Amino acid sequence: MDAQITLTTGLDEFLIRSANDLGIEINFKTESIRDANENYLSIVTVASANTQLAMYPAVEVLNYRGRLAIKPTDLNEDFLESLLVQVNLSAKNSSRDGVSTYIFSLSGELIEVFNSITIESLWSLEFARTSIFENALRAAHQLPLGRPDLKSMNWLIMNFDAPRILDMKQPYKHLFAHEPGYRIVKAASHSGYVALQDSEDLFKRVAHAVDYLEGAISE
């Protein structure tokens, strides 16, 4: 049996879609959602049994009223390189295959390592050459890993989870009329993420979309 992939509850639909795109079987289990830190950095690695390692760039994660906004970080390059070296050494010294999610404070302190696909991996579905979800599947099936590098350096993505009583059709029409560049992708009827790239005021625009989808604002 292929290796089992662990991921946060609510992300399984994205893993299933990636498996369908690859035309391969899937074996996974979910774990509960954890409380997020205020603002922090995330670096993800995917290791396969055939000694391949894909290390994704550091991204910055911002907490917005319980939702996570993820974007490329503009912190000092030497500082970020030192974190990547630390993660690379840790991954190579580990005998574990699969996904590892490293959480760092903005000052570089290692907070925790999760051996699973977490919500911090959402960004890769839109802005990595090969998503973390796809590479996790490739590693589980001992297939060659894809490229983890960024496709763009100007983007932001945020998750949403709207009350089930809300109608979701009208908000979509309203948002796309005001910003055709939105990517609104659902994991279920009332949850998913909003992504936007190559635009000014990315945080403001994406936060507005999430607020509107969740009924926090009406215009």
Locate predicted features.
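Internal nucleotide-binding/catalytic subdomain
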Residues: 5-6, 10-98, 104-108
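Peripheral (often C-terminal) accessory segments that flank ATP-dependent C-N-forming ligase machineries
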Residues: 11-14, 18-19, 31-33, 138-219
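A short beta-strand motif that forms the metal-chelation/ATP-contact edge
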Residues: 108-117
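Electropositive phosphate-/nucleotide-binding environments in soluble metabolic enzymes
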Residues: 9, 77, 81, 97, ...
